[in-house]
């Protein structure tokens, strides 16, 4: 049970968060877009793979399978077999991810400065509408990838209205 719970936290909590951050920031860092269909395939293949790997381990732990021993009783073989298949599927997801990154670098279109079309908030100069696309934070107001010394002056916020908390009646 401990093995399943621990790896659920690592593989599905932390790792999926890292992939989400990668896919969100990739166009900004590299300056190219990726194929969203390939990214969704990567997500679903990895999701199915890690669930097939770690969900059966809950049953193994509750059935008393010991950890850290070189050989397990044959009674645990079916669930271990399912976990092994899930690991192979997760391994395939690694190749889908690698191909997604390769495809983006080789064939990706140029990314806009604000590829996710975040709404406006900052202005950097009096002609900010020529330089940026009204981003909610500074990183979306400059080109992708971000050039060195991106701002000539400190940008100032246009409005703080979206930052106010709702009033409770």
Task: Write out the residue ranges for each language-model feature.
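Conserved small/polar residues in nucleotide/adenosyl-binding loops
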Residues: 161-167
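Hydrophobic cores of alpha-helical transmembrane segments in multi-pass integral membrane proteins
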Residues: 2-31, 35-69, 73-119, 124-160
């Amino acid at each position: 049970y401990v093995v399943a719970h621990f790896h659920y936290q690592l593989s599905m909590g932390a790792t999926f968060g890292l992939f989400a951050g990668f896919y969100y920031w990739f166009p900004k860092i590299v300056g190219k877009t990726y194929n969203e269909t390939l990214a969704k395939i990567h997500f679903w293949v990895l999701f199915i793979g890690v669930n097939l790997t770690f969900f059966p381990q809950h049953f193994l732990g509750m059935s008393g399978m010991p950890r850290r021993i070189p050989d397990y009783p044959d009674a645990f073989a079916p669930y271990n077999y399912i976990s092994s298949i899930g690991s192979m599927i997760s391994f395939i997801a690694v190749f889908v991810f690698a191909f997604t990154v390769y495809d983006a670098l080789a064939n990706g279109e140029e990314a806009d400065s604000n590829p996710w079309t975040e709404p406006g908030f900052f202005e950097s100069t009096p002609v900010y509408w020529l330089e940026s696309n009204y981003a909610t934070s500074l990183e979306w107001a400059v080109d992708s990838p971000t050039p060195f010394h991106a701002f000539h002056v400190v940008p100032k916020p246009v409005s703080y209205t979206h930052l106010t908390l709702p009033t409770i009646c």
